[in-house]
Amino acid sequence: MKPFLKWAGGKTQLIVEIERNLPPLVLFGKFTYIEPFVGSGAVLFWMLNNFPNMERAIINDINSDLINVYKIIASKPKQLISTLKDFQYKYHDLQNKEAEKKEYYYEKREQYNARNTDKVIQAALFIFLNRTCFNGLYRVNKSNSFNVPVGSYKSPRICDEQNNQRHQNHAHDCPHRRR
């Protein structure tokens, strides 16, 4: 299972090194996994896939919008997938209309920054922006407004339904906390 987000500082490349340094308890006993900086969840989902003796996982992140995404994946996956499919359809429909495609992106960014939509739409906007912005960066200004420009992807995969379902199946095992 791959992360559903692109994330600067993601730990995917470190998994082999992390595995080499795991304590024996993780390999042979029951344990709780605590992820202090969940980000894309690369290590979290690797742990969930490879260590059936893990009794639970606790995820944390200072980014409350990111934690909202994980909560929605666990609690309302069908609504999230439906909204993401709608965003993807509309965005891909603008494939040969670059000016309109950019306008759509910036409208969604403005909607995200207003933070006055319901939590499912806010989570879908977070994922949409992550998949369509420049290099998948997450950057906010002092006003906590997401300010990354549109990326140059032709047809980004905004809704990976199968991967989202796999994440949803594991998300129930993870209490979510924001520092």
Predicted feature locations:
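Short loop/edge segments at beta-strand edges and connector loops
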Residues: 177-179
